[in-house]
């Protein structure tokens, strides 16, 4: 049996930073060559400990920042109901659609926070005038619902 430190989550074995004992062949032929683990040494253990402590600090800071932005978005009237102008026909259908990039641009300028378009979740394409609800996923644990009102230019 060989001790290794996991540097990736491995199903059925453990998560990042765990010290596990595996058979020598599994370590030598699979885990280490694929970059999923490193051989256990005292130096490697200390290094992984430092990395995981820094990762936990970064994750805590990112979570707190996401919560602050979510509180700001929830409090501001401008971002609770975001208004977007779009070209539309007489029947209320848009020429094209409102995309996550459009929403992110307007939301960023309205709130003063940089919101990436990848954080905007639209359930179905917005192709009509009216009110639509979108989710802003600021962090895996922090989501904010925003009402988007699309009106004709």
Curated annotation (Swiss-Prot):
<keyword id="KW-0694">RNA-binding</keyword>
<comment type="similarity">
    <text>Belongs to the bacterial ribosomal protein bL9 family.</text>
</comment>
<keyword id="KW-0687">Ribonucleoprotein</keyword>
<dbReference type="InterPro" id="IPR009027">
    <property type="entry name" value="Ribosomal_bL9/RNase_H1_N"/>
</dbReference>
<dbReference type="InterPro" id="IPR020070">
    <property type="entry name" value="Ribosomal_bL9_N"/>
</dbReference>
<dbReference type="GO" id="GO:0006412">
    <property type="term" value="P:translation"/>
</dbReference>
<dbReference type="GO" id="GO:0003735">
    <property type="term" value="F:structural constituent of ribosome"/>
</dbReference>
<dbReference type="InterPro" id="IPR000244">
    <property type="entry name" value="Ribosomal_bL9"/>
</dbReference>
<keyword id="KW-0699">rRNA-binding</keyword>
<dbReference type="InterPro" id="IPR020594">
    <property type="entry name" value="Ribosomal_bL9_bac/chp"/>
</dbReference>
<dbReference type="Pfam" id="PF03948">
    <property type="entry name" value="Ribosomal_L9_C"/>
</dbReference>
<keyword id="KW-0689">Ribosomal protein</keyword>
<dbReference type="GO" id="GO:1990904">
    <property type="term" value="C:ribonucleoprotein complex"/>
</dbReference>
<comment type="function">
    <text>Binds to the 23S rRNA.</text>
</comment>
<dbReference type="InterPro" id="IPR036791">
    <property type="entry name" value="Ribosomal_bL9_C_sf"/>
</dbReference>
<dbReference type="Pfam" id="PF01281">
    <property type="entry name" value="Ribosomal_L9_N"/>
</dbReference>
<dbReference type="InterPro" id="IPR020069">
    <property type="entry name" value="Ribosomal_bL9_C"/>
</dbReference>
<dbReference type="InterPro" id="IPR036935">
    <property type="entry name" value="Ribosomal_bL9_N_sf"/>
</dbReference>
<protein>
    <recommendedName>
        <fullName>Large ribosomal subunit protein bL9</fullName>
    </recommendedName>
</protein>
<dbReference type="GO" id="GO:0019843">
    <property type="term" value="F:rRNA binding"/>
</dbReference>
<dbReference type="GO" id="GO:0005840">
    <property type="term" value="C:ribosome"/>
</dbReference>
């Amino acid at each position: 049996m060989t001790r290794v430190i996991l540097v990736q989550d491995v199903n059925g074995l453990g998560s990042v930073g765990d010290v596990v004992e595996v058979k020598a062949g599994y370590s030598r032929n699979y885990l280490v060559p694929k970059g999923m683990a490193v051989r256990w040494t005292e130096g490697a253990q200390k290094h992984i400990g430092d990395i995981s402590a820094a990762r936990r600090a970064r994750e805590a800071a990112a979570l707190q920042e996401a919560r602050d932005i979510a509180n700001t978005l929830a409090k501001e009237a401008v971002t609770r109901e975001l208004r977007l102008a779009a070209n539309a026909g007489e029947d209320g259908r848009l020429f094209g659609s409102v995309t996550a990039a459009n929403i992110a641009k307007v939301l960023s300028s309205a709130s003063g926070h940089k919101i990436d378009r990848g954080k905007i979740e639209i359930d179905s394409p917005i192709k009509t005038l009216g009110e639509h609800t979108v989710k802003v996923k600021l962090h895996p644990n922090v989501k904010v619902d925003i009402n988007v009102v699309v009106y004709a230019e």
